Amino acid sequence: MSKKYEGPSMMEELWEYVKMIVFVVVIVFIINNVLLINARIPSESMEKTIMTGDRVFGNRLAYMTKDPERFDIVIFKFPDDESQLFIKRVIGLPGETVTIKDGKVYINDSEEPLDDSFVAETPVGDFGPYKVPEGSYFMLGDNRNH
């Protein structure tokens, strides 16, 4: 007499689903906390490049093998309030002197201002000179009047 195959028990099947769900949760956790950063744009400081309310993903590992370059858009925690994420553009590099005259950005007493084709509107005001400390970067939003 042949024995009839009954398949996995209900508990075995349930256990397989639980393992699959735990696996997916672990993968999502790793992606969200190690590989990617998911941020919502809270203000108009980066408009016209990134609009208020947009969601952006950043690569948490991007600067493990290289340093940020001028004009990179980076997501970072503000040193004085690490609970908030900021999204800005790298303008000044470590050791450089940044000066803003009539809304134009100058690096190290250059006669030529930096490219500002991505800036939403012509900013007003002056700033600096400011020497960027080693290990730090000078960041600005693209919508400089906000």
Please identify what each model-predicted range represents.
Residues 2-19, 30, 34-40, 47-146:
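Soluble "head" domains of membrane/secretory-pathway proteins
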Residues 23-26:
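Residues within membrane-spanning alpha-helices of integral membrane proteins
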